[in-house]
Amino acid sequence: MQPVNIIGGGLAGSEAAWQLASRQIPVRLFEMRGREKTPAHSTDKLAELVCSNSFRSDDPNSNAVGVLHAEMRKMGSLIMMIADQHRVPAGSALAVDREGFAEAVTNRLQNHPLIEIHRERIDHIPDETTIIASGPLTSDSLANAITELTGRDALSFFDAIAPIVYRDSIDMDIAWFQSRWDKGDGHDYINCPLNKEEYLAFHAALLAGEKGDFHEWEKDTPYFEGCMPIEVMADRGIDTLRFGPMKPVGLDDPRTGRWPYGAVQLRQDNALGTLWNMVGFQTKLKYAEQIRIFRMIPGLEKAEFARLGGMHRNSFIRSPVLLDEYLRLKKQTNIRFAGQITGCEGYIESASIGLLAGIFTAADKLDKKVSSPPVESALGALLGHITKNADPDHYQPMNINFGLFPPISEKHPKKQRKAMMAERARKALDQWISEEAFLKSSILEQ
């Protein structure tokens, strides 16, 4: 059987290789580290953890990340198996001994008889079945090859992430639905008004807020005029924001009948309408500062954030436009993408998309049928966001969170609602595995 090529030996590529080889599919795994260095990595080990040693919450009953952990364990994930073996104390979080973890993943893949590891840089995309899992620091030559394949505007080289707020945490007694000048259907934006005193206090807080540092390899990341950090714009002058992302013109506050002094707009971020993006609020403020300062905005005093803002060097494609529900490139279905280059954010999210890419590719190679995971599961919710549910015109990397799951129809307290979503996800994944003959047999054989 012709081997599957996997480009990139990070978490996604390593997981995809394991899923394929475990189903008796030969793999050629290409990783340039060992021959060439990257600005971020310090070793040539596969699945090296670059920033943190934490896989975040391991609580499967009330945290979306913990639900994803549990699902991956159930699916026979190599990354989760090795993480559990190299766990270090971290309360309810899953943290690992990063050196032991990467060493163990490397040894497991090196010693698998169906996996060949090639220490070389790939400058072009092979014609054979290939999974591209090259990560946020994709080499320039491979990025050029991806651009040639997908189109000039399909690949981004840095992210400019604005915070995302859960819709049900916005105070609609203060905020209101309206598009500027009443364009659109009237429900395209949620608006939060500020009077002069509130605006000046917010502006001062932005300037004084503690900023995060760039990693060494990110220090040359450019600020483009269209996605300047909100605090950098604020530093240009007291009224810069009022003529930019906080422009109030064309917005009538129902409580006063007038335009506010300043306004923050939130735009719907997913098809379910559960997540709303703070328009133009990309930022390098530290996370705790973002929560404190953005809760100064009227209507967001009790805001719960599905994602906080940031700016990083990060290569990722416009997956909702380019990929089908099986992570295949629509225009060339022998090519799949996996990991952070698809626009998922986080170690475990990257590994989970690698897991799915490996399973889907194995099914193709063995001429078997397998459906995509149910949207009620964490795997299905993340996959659905990447491939179809996210706004393709404003696509930015996303962590797993309960805002990606279909909402619970009945009204319940937040804690109970999360527990209900977690339980629903467990049942949905179990049913999916039991009904998919290919999954049922191949997971048992691992």
From Swiss-Prot:
EC number(s) on file: 2.1.1.74
InterPro entries documented for this protein: FAD/NAD-bd_sf (IPR036188), MnmG-rel (IPR002218), MnmG-rel_CS (IPR020595), MnmG_N (IPR040131), TrmFO (IPR004417)
Keywords: Cytoplasm, FAD, Flavoprotein, Methyltransferase, NAD, NADP, Transferase, tRNA processing
Primary residence: cytoplasm
Reactions performed catalytically: uridine(54) in tRNA + (6R)-5,10-methylene-5,6,7,8-tetrahydrofolate + NADH + H(+) = 5-methyluridine(54) in tRNA + (6S)-5,6,7,8-tetrahydrofolate + NAD(+); uridine(54) in tRNA + (6R)-5,10-methylene-5,6,7,8-tetrahydrofolate + NADPH + H(+) = 5-methyluridine(54) in tRNA + (6S)-5,6,7,8-tetrahydrofolate + NADP(+)
Binding of FAD, residues: G8, G9, G10, L11, A12, G13
Top-rank lineage group of the source organism: Bacteria
Pfam families: GIDA (PF01134)
GO BP, sorted A to Z: tRNA methylation; tRNA wobble uridine modification
Localization per record: Cytoplasm
Keyword Lipoprotein: no
GO CC field: cytosol
Cofactor: FAD
Molecular functions (GO terms): flavin adenine dinucleotide binding; tRNA (uracil(54)-C5)-methyltransferase activity, 5,10-methylenetetrahydrofolate-dependent
Function: Catalyzes the folate-dependent formation of 5-methyl-uridine at position 54 (M-5-U54) in all tRNAs.
NCBIfam families: gid_trmFO, PRK05335.1
Protein family membership: Belongs to the MnmG family. TrmFO subfamily.
Protein name (record): Methylenetetrahydrofolate--tRNA-(uracil-5-)-methyltransferase TrmFO
Gene name tied to this protein: trmFO
